[in-house]
A protein has these predicted regions:
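Pyridoxal 5′-phosphate
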Residues: 5-428
Length: 428
């Protein structure tokens, strides 16, 4: 974000802090201006100021921000404010006053993603965004779709429904975690391509192990063969910085209630402008909207308060800075993983290459059932992680902190797990 906008727009971001926190936050950001992101990642005074923006329950250690993240107070207050405005007379205020502001949200999302606003549809989550494309593509019996066995289950289910309904063929490739290289991932995906392949569906970063995929490399290889690529960016957008042109894809769907910290139930779909007409909307739209990105938003009455609060979340994100966030996420992941990685039976299934990983960490302990480990951490210590099993390949727990996570919380998690490993078992 431009410095001028930050200094001007950061005040709304921090308006929900304690009375003097606005000035503290502004001073903190001014003090780190010009410093490298890796240095700021370890600056606990800076991140303390950021933590003041949240009203999270510190009686739990939430390391499942990959599922859904809490919004800063400025976002929840904006949502409440828009609800109150709407309640004064929804037929007027929701439709005539708040409704048109969706165009500001569209413009801000497009600016952050690096595309034309006329290529952004605001959705309720990544699943809806992606299913618009999956169900709206013109495919016939025998057409092949290539994805991986580690893509998001809901998206795989969507393609399986098209198998049952339309007779398409879904092919799922496996891959090593962590992979030896990005080229390896491209080779694995492209190895399943045949003359009948019409679509490749990949995660920008997987929800399971946090493996980042070489999207542009796969898109270029696919486009040379006339194959469309659908990119699931549910965990990528705002976890680490990138733009549309870094990907070169035609279709991209993401959630905004994870790393953007927007209200729960927000997301967006990007469709390259010349491809909008090729995709049927999930809900009916008139022929006059065939080439209009807004046809994908024709879902009936829905609350303006959620989508309009996205702009506050984007301002908060921009105020911190994408590079700073990514550096902090990597720092937190390495802090716990470096402490545990050399213990008996431990595998950290994340590449140390920053091009391949960011904030999502994956811990596997030989002999430890992931479900029992996650349950013990929650029941005994109120630490929240996600158990994940990829049958026949790997299993463990996913660990996802966020900008409000403290070093004490990370160290508590690592200390508890270390004691369990040295004990050799999970208490019954």
């Amino acid at each position: 974000m431009h410095r001028r906008r930050f200094l001007g727009s950061s005040l709304p971001v921090f308006a929900a802090f304690q009375s003097d926190s606005v000035f503290q936050a502004k001073a903190a950001v001014e003090q780190v201006a010009g410093r490298p992101a890796d240095s700021i990642a370890m600056d606990e005074d800076f991140w303390l100021t950021i933590r003041h923006a949240f009203s999270v329950d510190r009686n739990i250690i939430n390391l499942n921000n990959g599922g859904v993240s809490p919004s800063p107070k400025v976002v929840t207050e904006a949502e409440h404010r828009y609800n109150e405005i709407s309640a004064m007379g929804p037929a007027h205020f929701m439709w005539n006053v708040l409704g048109p502001e969706i165009e500001t949200v569209r413009r801000r999302l497009a600016e952050t993603f690096g595309c034309d606003p006329e290529e952004i549809a605001i959705t309720r989550n990544a699943s809806e965004a992606l299913e618009i494309v999956q169900m709206g593509m013109r495919l016939k019996a025998g057409d092949e779709v290539v994805t991986t066995n580690q893509d998001y289950p809901r998206m795989i289910t969507c393609w399986q429904q098209r198998e049952r309904r339309d007779g398409i063929v879904l092919k799922q490739v496996t891959f090593q975690v962590p992979p030896p290289s990005m080229d390896y991932l491209t080779e694995r995906v492209m190895s399943a391509v045949t003359p009948r392949t019409r679509v490749i569906h990949i995660c920008h970063i997987t929800n399971r192990s946090g493996q980042i995929f070489p999207v542009r490399q796969i898109v270029r290889a696919a486009r040379a063969r006339g194959i469309d690529v659908v990119v699931d960016g549910a965990h990528a957008f705002a976890q680490f910085p990138f733009k549309r042109d870094d990907l070169e894809c035609d279709f991209y769907g993401t959630s905004l209630h994870k790393w953007v910290l927007a209200p729960i139930g927000t997301g967006f779909l990007y469709v390259r402008k010349n491809r909008i007409k090729d995709i049927w909307p999930l809900m009916a739209a008139p022929p006059s909207m065939d080439g209009d990105i807004r046809k994908f938003e024709e879902i009936g009455t829905n609350p303006a308060s959620l989508r309009n609060s996205i702009t506050e979340a984007l301002t908060f994100h921009d105020s911190i800075g994408g590079e700073r966030k990514a550096a902090r996420f990597r720092y937190l992941r390495k802090r716990w993983s470096n402490r545990l990685r050399n213990l008996p039976g431990v595998q950290i299934l994340n590449s140390e290459d920053p091009e391949q990983s960011c904030g999502i960490g994956f811990l596997s302990v030989k002999g430890f059932d992931p479900g029992k480990l996650a349950a013990h951490l929650w029941d005994k210590y109120r630490i929240m992680v996600v158990p994940i099993v990829t049958p026949g390949e790997y299993e463990g727990v996913r660990v996802t902190p966020n900008v409000y996570t403290t070093l004490e919380e990370i160290d508590t998690f690592a200390e508890v797990v270390e004691k369990l490993i040295r004990r050799g078992s999970i208490p019954a």
